[in-house]
A protein has these predicted regions:
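Transmembrane alpha-helices and adjacent helix-loop boundaries
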Residues: 1-212
Length: 212
């Protein structure tokens, strides 16, 4: 049962990292735009989701948004805790990844942009085929660190009724009247997952250093 909870935590973290990268790319493009309105949209997104607790974001999506939907449609709406958790984690992670990806893009030599313009590539083609591959090579280690953070933050969706690793330990503790063993096991599983991912991060960082 506890390993099932670990699976859900891991899947949530993977999903949030994936969607967070997409949001991060979009947000970074907005913040690097020459247009004031687009830059403002990117800045507002980052400030809102970096400036408020993830727990508040999770509860807002699960409790407040259904109330708004119900008032508009006149029908009862029940949000899914896993979907709300995934959306909140993705939005929060994306806000942090905006700055990571933005710094990676800015780290690419400006001559690359000029070369792409010379051979006739448009902005999207330049980003897709030239700039982003180089930018992501620079930011893979911090992205892996973000993944570790997401694994630990997945425990927050326990507050809205989703059964992940920490929630599973709580249920086992309530059923057995013994919280020591399940909570200790949960801590050990979190530790094993984060240590394994940290080892992967160090390996990747070493490989990237050699390739450079």
């Amino acid at each position: 049962m506890i390993f099932t909870g670990a699976k859900y935590s891991l899947l949530l973290a993977i999903g949030a990292l994936f969607f967070g990268v997409i949001l991060g790319i979009i947000g970074a493009a907005l913040k690097l735009s020459k247009h004031f309105v687009l830059r403002a949209i990117g800045n507002i997104y980052v400030e809102i989701f970096r400036g408020t607790p993830m727990l508040l974001q999770i509860m807002f999506l699960y409790l407040a948004v259904p109330t708004v939907v119900q008032s508009i449609t006149g029908q009862r709406f029940q949000a899914d805790p896993y979907v709300c958790g995934l959306i909140a984690m993705s939005l929060n992670s994306g806000a942090y990844q905006v700055e990571l990806i933005r710094s990676g893009i800015l780290g690419v030599d400006k001559g690359q942009w000029e070369a792409c313009e010379t051979i006739g590539l448009n902005y999207v083609q330049t980003m897709r085929y030239v700039i982003l591959p180089q930018a992501f090579k620079r930011i893979i280690p911090p992205l892996i660190s973000e993944f570790i953070t997401l694994i630990k933050d997945s425990s927050l969706i326990f507050t809205i009724g989703a059964v992940e690793l920490l929630a599973t330990a709580s249920v086992i503790g309530a059923n057995t009247f013994n919280y020591l063993v399940p909570l200790t096991a949960t801590g050990a599983i979190y530790l094993v997952m984060t240590l394994c991912i940290s080892a992967i991060a160090r390996y990747v960082e070493g490989r990237l250093a050699v390739s450079d």
